[in-house]
Design a protein with these regions (language model features):
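Short, surface-exposed ligand- or partner-binding patches at beta-edge/loop junctions that are enriched
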Residues: 154-159, 303-316, 494-504
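Histidine-centered copper-binding motifs that mark active-site loops
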Residues: 4, 15-16, 28-297, 318-397, ...
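Active/binding-pocket-proximal capping segment
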Residues: 263-274, 410, 434-469, 495, ...
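Extended, solvent-exposed segments with strong compositional bias
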Residues: 285-287, 472-479
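N-terminal secretory signal peptides
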Residues: 1-10
């Protein structure tokens, strides 16, 4: 842990003083120290090593591709599996049960700083992967946390300051699959993943030698012209004529997908970011923005010896707000930025909102066991819009080609007064999208429920509105142009400084990210 503490001290020395209702650096240090766990009291059930390193893998025919990836190893303990994916840049897949305590040793063998963010689960501040916790080449960071959340399709990825987007493009992402007894009763094989089909959808650009080409634009971020599933192109799953569970992650930096089956069978949604829904949500298609996960129950019983394609359908990503409605473009009068027309069509051979195939399911003749979906349990808490007459507003905007939240940009050690909450506070926040493009808004260390959408009066919204699934727990929510999205949540049990941001990774790196502080009675008094 010495590298982590040194990092924190170095950041605090460089932080300086902030003004205008913000926490001063030395007082913020007190908050961070008081929120850190006592590591000598932690007794893990399992210890895992994760190493970030460069390697070469075969993605396209011809030359291999240089990638960065994680490699995992189970060092001690039982009840946890760590599955590496040979010949792939993705992974590992870590499968663990709710209630288990993990100690993870993160080794950085890259030539630049990095840090891992566990995306979805609530963890102590010291293990959340804030950019200030990044470690340098050759260093190690220790993560210690208990899985306190319900079963869900969580994941992990890098989160260094201004380098998250390119590190993810280079290949760094893994799955943290959490199961519990409730899920095991509802979904056959939940504890083992017997019926699971993990699907990580990404898009990439390649140069003439098959190397990843990172060429984002300022508006849309990085849009690739090749679709990869689980790190490979042209994916075909050979499956039996029975039901399977498709656990889909949008692992792209910026691209939104409108998922549908080619035979028009409905998308049967059984879960979202934070686990199972209280009831199956049937949709003609499902919208999936970067960072979001969706859990689909797909029954191929009637499709023996046939093929069905999972596609992304066309949609209008612009919201009818080319001028940035409400000043969202800072008076720039159009998209600007060079090659950023509607859907980024000049910056990518596959514009945002265009239609394309993602993967093919080739159904065989016979099935062995035929799993049957059990009853889904009700949520332990249901928030309702009428219980939250007021909400803290957070306006998403753009000024002079800089993305902002409430007019602010990211500062490493800055927390404003309206970004302070207390452990066990239950409240609503409202995202207000004043920009011409959609944003997937992600919060660290909390699962929330979308309780209200105030929709814009634009024809483009009709191209996506049937694909929203708001009936479960979320950590990332789509906010369409001109839309207001009210979310409700209870903070805790961990106190400390966490983050919220747009999960278009280029937007995050370009300052569309802020800190928020969860305070408790053990912390020093708030600065006046």
């Amino acid at each position: 842990m010495s590298s982590q503490n040194l990092n924190r001290r170095d950041f605090l020395k460089l932080a300086g003083i902030s003004y205008g209702g913000l926490l001063f650096g030395n007082r913020l240090d007190s908050y961070l120290k008081s929120s850190s766990p006592q590591m000598d009291e932690f007794m893990p059930d399992a210890e895992i090593a994760i190493t970030a390193k460069e390697k070469w893998v075969q993605i396209l025919s011809g030359s291999q591709t240089r990638v960065w990836g994680y490699e995992g190893q189970l060092l001690s303990g039982s009840g946890v599996t760590v599955q590496n994916l040979p010949g792939n840049y993705l992974g590992p897949i870590i499968r663990v049960k709710t209630g288990m305590k993990l100690r993870i040793y993160f080794h950085n063998e890259l030539a630049e700083d990095s840090v891992i963010h566990p995306h979805g689960p609530r963890v102590p501040e010291a293990s959340d992967g804030h950019p200030m916790q990044a470690i340098g080449p050759g260093q190690m960071k220790v993560y210690e946390f208990e899985i306190i959340d319900r079963a869900g399709p969580y994941w992990f990825h890098p989160h260094p300051h201004m380098r998250t987007a390119e590190q993810v493009v280079m290949g760094m992402a893994g799955l943290l699959s959490v199961w519990d007894d409730e899920e095991e009763l509802a979904v056959p094989g939940a504890s083992t993943g017997l019926n699971d089909i993990p699907v990580i959808i990404q898009d990439r650009n390649f140069d003439s030698t098959n190397q990843f080409l990172y060429n984002p634009n300022n508006m849309w971020g990085y849009l690739g012209n090749r679709i990869l599933v689980n790190g490979k192109p042209n994916t075909v799953f050979a499956l039996e004529p029975r039901a399977y569970r498709f656990r889909i992650l949008n692992g792209s930096n910026a691209r939104t997908y409108k998922l549908a089956w080619s035979n028009n069978m409905p998308m049967q949604v059984i879960g979202t970011d934070g686990g199972l829904l209280p009831a199956v949500a049937s949709r003609p298609y499902v919208m999936l923005m970067p960072g979001e996960r969706i859990d689909i129950w797909a029954d191929f019983t009637a499709l023996a010896r046939k093929q069905v394609i999972l596609r992304s359908l066309s949609f209008d990503p612009m919201g009818g707000m080319m001028g940035g409605g409400g000043g969202g473009m800072g008076g720039s009068g159009g998209m600007g930025g060079g090659g950023m027309g509607g859907g980024g069509m000049m910056g990518s051979g596959l514009p945002m909102g265009s239609a394309f195939d993602i993967l093919t399911v080739s159904v065989g003749r016979r099935a062995g066991t035929k799993p049957v979906l059990g009853p889904l349990a009700p949520l332990s808490v249901i928030y309702k819009a009428e219980d939250f007459a007021t909400a803290r507003p957070f306006t998403l905007d753009m000024s002079m080609m800089t993305w902002t939240i409430n007019g602010r940009v990211f500062e490493m050690m800055e927390v404003a007064e309206d970004e302070m909450v207390h452990v066990h506070d239950t409240m609503a926040w409202e995202w207000i999208n004043n920009t011409p493009i959609p944003h997937p808004m992600h919060m660290h260390n909390v699962q929330f429920q979308v309780v209200q959408r105030t929709v814009p009066a634009t024809s483009s919204y009709a191209t996506i509105n049937q694909g929203l699934v708001d009936t479960g727990w979320k950590d990332t929510a789509p906010v369409w142009p001109g839309e207001r999205v009210k979310i409700a949540m209870t903070f805790g049990p961990h106190a400390g400084m966490y983050m919220y941001h747009c999960h278009i990774l280029e937007h995050e790196d370009m300052t569309m990210m802020r800190n928020y502080m969860i305070m408790d009675h053990t912390m020093p008094p708030m600065p006046m």
